[in-house]
Structures are given as C-alpha cells and as structure tokens.
Amino acid sequence: MVDVNRFKSMQITLASPTKVRSWSYGEVKKPETINYRTLKPEREGLFDEVIFGPTKDWECACGKYKRIRYKGIVCDRCGVEVTRAKVRRERMGHIELKAPVSHIWYFKGIPSRMGLTLDMSPRALEEVIYFAAYVVIDPKETPLERKSLLTEREYREKLQEYGQGSFVAKMGAEAIQDLLKQVDLEAEIAELKEELKTATGQKRFKAVRRLDVLDAFYKSGNKPEWMVLNILPVLPPDLRPMVQLDGGRFAASDLNDLYRRVINRNNRLARLLELGAPGIIVQNEKRMLQEAVDALIDNGRRGRPITGPGSRPLKSLSHMLKGKQGRFRQNLLGKRVDFSGRSVIAVGPTLKMYQCGVPRLMAIELFKPFVMREIVAREYAGNVKAAKRMVERGDERIWDILEDVIKEHPVLLNRAPTLHRLGIQAFEPVLIDGKALRLHPLVCEAYNADFDGDQMAIHVPLSEEAQAEARLLLLAAEHILNPKDGKPVVTPSQDMVLGNYYLTMEDEGREGEGMIFKDIDEAVMAYHNGYVHLHSRVGIAVDSMPDKPWKENQLHKILVTTVGKILFNSIIPSEIPYLQETTNENLTDSTPDKYFLEPGQDIQTVIDSLEINAPFKKKHLGNIIAEIFKRLRTTETSAFLDRLKDLGYYYSTLAGLTVGIADIPVIDNKQEIIDAAHHRVEEINKAFRRGLMTEDDRYVAVTTTWREAKDALEKRLIETQDPKNPIVMMMDSGARGNISNFSQLAGMRGLMAAPNGRIMELPILSNFREGLSVLEMFFSTHGARKGMTDTALKTADSGYLTRRLVDVAQDVIIREDDCGTDRGLVIRAITDGKEVTETLEERLFGRYTKKSVKHPETGEVIVGPDTLITEDMAAAIVNAGVEEVTIRSVFTCKTRHGVCRHCYGINLATGDAVEVGEAVGTIAAQSIGEPGTQLTMRTFHTGGVASNTDITQGLPRIQEIFEARNPKGEAVITEVKGTVIEIEEDAATRTKKVFVQGKTGMGEYVVPFTARMKVEVGDEVHRGEALTEGSIQPKRLLEVRDTLSVETYLLAEVQKVYRSQGVEIGDKHVEVMVRQMLRKVRVMDPGDTDLLPGTLMDISDFTDANKDIVISGGVPATSRPVLLGITKASLETNSFLSAASFQETTRVLTDAAIRGKKDHLIGLKENVIIGKIIPAGTGMARYRNIEPLAVNEVEVIENIAVDEAIVESSED
C-alpha cells in the first residue's frame, strides 16, 4: 500500500487495454452473483472469490486453509488465495468485449472529444456508433470521401457500383476505432496551426477547439483509440456490495444489474458470432452491448435511462461520483468519525470559558479505551477484555479513573451549520449528571447557539499531537476575536448585560448618599447591611485601590462613585483606569478629574454638581473587552469575561426585572398625531383628484405622511419614557429588543408590505398593547409569512455561496514571509455618493505600508515604509489629514498559489501579524459567507417610484458580483478620458446622447431616457467612469481599464452591500476572493511559445512560459486578463481533484484524463480527498520537516546558550 503522506502528485490518464488487463485479477464470464442456497459467490461470476479474494479473513472458499499462518497460499482445491477479506475492496476483474464499444464520456460530453479528434459532427458519430449508418474508412481507388456516411441502402448500391472489396466502410464503435487509429496527431496539429494564421470567426473558433484536444492527446501520450473500449474493467465487489436483509431478501448495488446486462449481452454476442448468425442480428446485438456499456458508465446520458423496479433509474458509475451523495462529497471530503457523540445543549453558567459539561454516560463511552488502559495499568483487571467488562458493567471504580483520564484532555464541540471556523472549538470536559451537554453562555454567539433544543456534536482528539493542537489552537478561551472583522465575538448578552447595566446605574437621593468609605470592603459591607444603596453616589479613598493607574494629581483624594461601580471595577484588570463613566477617554486614558474631591470640599456639594451618568450598556462592555484584549491579550481577557458573566448573572437576579402590561406606557397625544396624519392624507388625495400630482407622487406623499406620523409617536415615546421602566431598561441596555419593538408595543405598528413587496397605503394604527383589529391582523400576516419564506430560501442560497467561495479560494495559504513585489495599492475611504461606507482608518489598520506616509503639511514621516500599521498609527495618519495611502495588498502580491505575510498584514483573529501556513483563503470565504444569512433577499420594489430600475441589493447583489454577471440596472461607462461637452435628449427614440470630448477623439454614448445622470456638461471624466447611476459591468470595465481598477471596484461594491446591512468584513477577505477571480489570462497570440491561442491559463504559468522565450530572444506570447465568476474559476483550477469534487464531475474528469493531468496537491481539498495531511498550518512542509531533538541534545544547546550569554556579558 502506498504511504499517502509520501507521494507528491497524482495523475489521471486514459486507460489502455494493457493497463486494464494489468489491473485485473481474472475475467468475469458469467452474470451470476451468489448461489441462492449456499449464499456463496458463484465461480467466474461477479463476486467470484478466485478473482476478487476471500469473503472471510485468512480463509479460502472451501475451508481447507484457515487461519493467518497460511497467508499467501493459493488453495489447490478452490483456487482462492488466503489473505485479508478487504482485498475485495481493491481487486478488479475485467470483461473481454466481443466487439469494441465507445466510451460515452468521450463521445457524448460537450464538446464531443471523439468528434473533435476526427473532425466529425456528434450526430454523424451517433449514427455510426449505434449502427444507423456506415462510415467510409478507406475509399481506396473509388471517388468516395474518407469519413463520409452511407446509409444501408447507399452502401449496397456503392458495393454493386464499385465491386466487392473496392473500398472499406464499417459500422459501430469498431469503425470509429479504426478511424481514431489512423489519426496522425503531429501532422494534424501542424496543419491546424497553419490554418489558424489565416482563419477568422467560427472557423477559427472550431480550429482552436480541435487543436486543444489534439494537442492534449499529443502531449499526454494518450492514444485517441483508447476512447473506444475493447476490454471493460469490473469494479471490486465490496464497492458494489450485496447484503442480506432480514427476511432472506437481498439488497444489491445497481451496478451489479448493469454489469449483468453487459455480461449477458456480451456472452450472447459471442454465441451469435460462433454460430455465424446473419449480419443484421449480430449488428443488433452489438448495438445492445454498446447501450449496456453506456448505461453502466453513465446511465441516462443518452436516451432513456435503464430503470429498476418501480421505474427508478439505476445508479451508474458516473452517478457514484456526482453530487452531494457521490463519492467525492459524501465519503472523501468528509467522513463520519468514531469517538464522537451528539446531544442537546443546556446552559452552563458556572463553567469557565475553557470548560464544557459532558454527561458521565457520554464521557465513559467516548473515553472507553483510555479508561480501559488505565484499569489495566492500575491492575484492577488482568487484561483488556476484563477491563471492557468492568466498564460495561458500570463498576464503581471506573468513575474515579474517568475523572483522571479526562483531566487535561480537551474535546471538540461543533454545532451545525458550521458557517465559520468558530463553529468548532475545544473545551476541557467537566463531568456532569444528566444527559445534556453544558455550554458556556459566552461562546453561544460564535456558535450562533441557543438553548431551545439545539444539539451539538462532541469529538475526542486522540493522538498527542491532536490534543496539543486542540489545546493550543482551538481552545475556546483563545477565540476572543472574530476572524471576519477583528472585533470581540464573545460579548455578553441578555442577562449578563442587564445585570451589569443595573449594577452601574446612578440615582439621586438614595439611602447612604454622600457616605465616604476607607476601602472597598467597607463599602461592600455597608451595602450588604443596608446602609447604602447600590446606586447611591458615595466617596471612596483613592489610596485603597493602589493598583489602578491614577494620575499624579488624583492620589490621596476621595473619588465620587457608586457602590455598584466599585463592585464593577473590582473585576476589571488593574491596568485599566477606574471606569466612572462610559466615555472612551475614561477607558483609554484616565478617570476624569471632576469626580475627585479637592481637600476641604463638601462631598454633597460635589455630588449635586455632577450629572447622573449613564450605566454601561452592551456596546460599552464590548469596548471594554476590546481594550482589555488590546492591552493584555487572550488569557487575561477570558478570565475577565468569566468574572463579567458571574457579576452580570448575580445582579440580574438581584434586580429581578419583570414585565407586565402596566409597564407599557400610554402616549397621551397619540390620537392628535393620527388625526393630523389623516387630515394630511385627505389633502393629498384631494390634490390628486384635481390633477395637481401624478399617481406616483400621491403614493409617495401618503406613505411618507404615515412614516412621519410613526416617527412622531416614536419620538414622543422616547421623550416621555421612564429610565427605570423594565422594558426601557432591557431595550436601553441592549439586553433585548430595540426601539422599533418598543414603538410597536406602545406607539403604532405603521405601514406594512403587501405580498408583492409594495408598501400598502393603509397603516396599522393600533399597537400591541391596544390590540389589533381583524383587518389589521390580516394585513400584518403578509409580512410575517414573507419573512419566514425569505429566511428559508436565504439560508440555502447563502450556504451555496459559502461553498463556492471556499472552493475558489481553498488553496490560498500564506506561503512566504515577503514576496518582494514592487507594486502597492493606493487606498482611500470608500464612499457611496456623499456617504462614507468604510473609513480610511478602518482600511489602514493591520496592513503594511508600501511607501512611507508623510504629514501633508509638515512633511514629517508618520509611518515608515513596510511597517505594520497599528490602530494608533492609523488614527495618527487620518488625524494628520492624509487622504490616501499606498499599502501592500493581496491584489499586488507576487506569491504563487497564495499570499505572503507582508501583503496580507494582520491576522484579524489574533491581532498579530499573520503566520506562514495560515489558510487565509478559507478564512476569507467563511468571513464573507457566514454573514450571508443576515443579508436581505429582496430586490427593492419602490412601486415604480424614484428610480427607473429596481436596485439589486443584499444576497442577490453579492452573488451578482462574485459570479461576475451583468448587473441589473447597468450603468453606461465612458471609454475616453475627457470632458462632457453635450447631453442631447432625443424624444423620438426616448434616449439621451452624451458626448465626451477627449484628446484622442469624441465618445458618443446612448443612455436610456429614464436613467439618472451622474455627470453634467463640463464635468471631467476618466476612462471607465459611470455616466449614469447603477452598477458597472466589471467585464466591460476590464476592457476599458486595467486589472487593478476592476479589483478595486469589486472590493468597494462588496463592502457597500455588507456595510449597508451593518455587517463589517475586513477588506483583506474580499481582496483574497477578488484576486482569485482575476488569476487567469487568455492567450491571444502565442508568439514563439508552444502555447495555444485562446487557452485560459494562470498568470504565473503564462509568465513562466514567456520567460525562456524572452531570454533566448524570441517573440513572447501576448494575453489579455479574464474575469471569471467564482463557479467558473473553481472549475478552471489546476487541480482536477478539487474541480471534480466541486461541480460537473464527469466533464472535469473527462478533460483531465485526455490531458493526462497531474494534480500537484497544492490546495486543501485535494489533500483531504487522498487522505494526506493538509499543507496548511502545522501540516505545512516547513513545520513537518522539523526533527525533534533528544533530551541530551537540548541540554547541550542550553549549555552553549548559557556560555554565550556569559561571554557577551563579560564583553559588555
């Protein structure tokens, strides 16, 4: 068996007849499977033990040789080799076909490879192969043309006319095989290359396609005649099994039926040929054999599929590979694993960040081998069998052992759907009673889990290395930041937020106000004894908190704060200032001076002069977490998060917030606002009836009126709300609900959308507290139903988008430290009209500069070249008034099959520079795909208002961008740089004409009459700039501008969609995906290279092909860049394994086999498929080739290091 981790590449070619014979262990001559009485395989049948190996380990068929000691002996009675039964999964047989048969993939695929090789139409091929016509193979002296078709009648007439044997014409695959043998590849290729020099149009296109196929055969060493089969391989029997069901019936794989048909027809054909049957009968039998082999290889590709019982089409070999249930996606890319379990999850509020609760019953089953080993080691049992019995009986002693075994042994928890890498994290197991897994509440957000019946899977990493990786790389406490935007993903929610909000509230005149305490303990004791309220403002000696970073002038003073804030600050690391207010200055700099008593000042006077501070809300807690992470990194942050969680839960319980109907306020002037709106609507309708406005204008005015009425109610609600109202507290703290929910409870529900997406003019005037009328209830159900269907459709769409994104970028890995590129990317803030979509500061953070950044006024260098920009540097650059910066970018990186560290920058998930080996392509795909479900589905229906086209937004727009489709509502772009000199309206054709005067000439552009113009007369325009509103077609932009312009445009467009929905994604993720779409070029003129015109190839391969030619002084090839959609780009990848496992499996494999393609196993998927360790992370060659040192070597090195240090210090 080949060691899978040793081989470098994998090649696929056409199998020659000799190759098939060399695979085979014997010919299958009979269609029988197994004997119905003995249930033993029949001799020379499809399950024969002589050919395929024994059905039982180390046992021949007749039972003469049993046991392993006869290994390798071939039984003299039954002829079966004594070996392992699993050889029945790898040993193949063969069938000697009595007539050649064409392979349907090469004849029926698009384009037909046989047709292109022979320069015959697929229709003509079909007629010949299925015995409807003769083809002339050798016209000899006759005027017939080679490869011309003759019907039965014409054939007889020509024979009479020219005499027997005067020419050769045949039918069936045999004829095609003869023609294929006659093809002289070298001569044909030379002829086609000549033809290409002059050919144009359709003729050129056809010649390029033919040349491509012939060249593939020539270079790969495959012979064209191998597309016709003379010998058919038979799949090993355990890959097409027959299993006995209860009740004595058998379930067999469909392949057995398909093979049986082939064998039956082949045997019948042999008999007919022996008997010398009439030609027409033999022909019919050959045709049936051809159809049987077609069905076996790809049932249903031609004609009606062969069906089994209940008219179900049989699954052929091709179907075994295709689709989600096929071999690639079902068994090779992901497998079911042992040492795993799944259960319902419940909340574990007492757990630490790195722990999870595992039920005892699950743990004993999952860790069974470890427990058994320990039982034997402790000599509770003599052998493994006895130990197993102990575990299964549930002996008391096993629980102590289990406790010891799971110590320090992390487990992985996974929740489906795993949308991003935080969907699998490692935890240390804690044994619990019950049957549900316990999950830490803070990791719920990363998993998108809740406790309404969600289930999770648990996996045990077995090897030492796997455990080490789980502990160091996957531990939940390490995953504080989200890889998509570098923001904390473990922010407290709901009860935790509410508890901390309640704790940090301030109130006037509560008991104990103005008391002064000497230290924290005294303050807390006073609170517990009821002398002071949690929200009362009191004083505390600054000196009692010596660890905090006080300013010089604040020492030895009294700080005015509340008991709640004292408790809140007691859990915050001492490096962070004392948090007295929610401002950024307090968090990053120091506690403001106004909260400190000057000597001799009265505390009550100071308290009265201070405003009431807002409590800490969800977003403030998020800022605190981010700041702590920035300063103290992972370990301290996760410890703090646990303290925050415990505090939040405790005070949430103490606060005891409840909600009743009385807590929903009543707005005093609601009726007035609604009456005023009714009056306004009546006026609008009157104006419309008088003909003063159009229907569209009236509709807009009415809906706007109702929107304004709803907003007025909302505003009134906010003005009159009581900050201690439980609903207000929940909403304000960010624990649950938002202003829109609140206004539907207490204000009015407002306008609803009709089923067609158009907003209905009749609003719902009631709110939920008053209750809805029947009609209002009916109106509001449209939206609810549409919401449900949208969500369901969106989930599937978003999942498929993620899959395509992963596929196109899975081989993008950080390959080297620095690619040494001399290009950079100039970036500025991304704007949409006047609005800023993404600020320059956000775009700069975590990138390397290309050139140094200078102050625009003073000229001093703010950041040097090739420096990693930190948050502070980014802020300094923007504050200096710099508007554009040249940075290192993925777009300009020269690394092959990946990116270098400097062009990528920071790893957003860790906050440090990215490591070599990071699989940034997969991370990028997940970061873009995971928020896909949050995007809207809708194309906006404005009811024919405002714009001439519906604007595509949300998920459909993202798909449009990544698939490089022509956008809806396309903008007209200019091809010349110059000035707009005239915009002419033509009422007759309902168009406008825009004239742009450039240096080289005049550009004239026809624009639809209804399109909204972006330019006016006198405006300066650049090539590729949009003249009208709408989306630019990227392929068109590529023709007018360069690759970088297209890349920058696509990046900005993706960001616009996500940011408009409030989703933040790092630029670099989009850059990785967009770069993959522009990796290919199309060869225009091959020059002196041996490239073929019209070929799609990787930029790096193209450059390599040109390099040698340029050095030797030849004419280099020319090419033009091509923008491919992600699906197309995935299928065009150099790895055929990756492409075949993605989509269009048969087409990819057909093409790869003809070309004799080699897969160099560069990406992740191809390595997973063959079971090799993936070349990313710790699987990279540079990390795998490290030799561990022996202990004594380590000591030697340490001693040397110590000696060197001593020498250095003495030199100092």
Curated annotation (Swiss-Prot):
Cofactor(s) required for function per UniProt: Mg(2+); Zn(2+)
The UniProt record lists the keyword Lyase: no
Keyword Zinc appears in the UniProt entry: yes
GO biological process terms held by the UniProt record: DNA-templated transcription
SMART domains recorded: RPOLA_N
InterPro entries found in the cross-reference section: DNA-dir_RpoC_beta_prime, DNA-dir_RpoC_beta_prime_bact, RNA_pol_asu, RNA_pol_N, RNA_pol_Rpb1_1, RNA_pol_Rpb1_3, RNA_pol_Rpb1_3_sf, RNA_pol_Rpb1_4
Organism: Streptococcus thermophilus (strain ATCC BAA-250 / LMG 18311)
Protein name: DNA-directed RNA polymerase subunit beta'
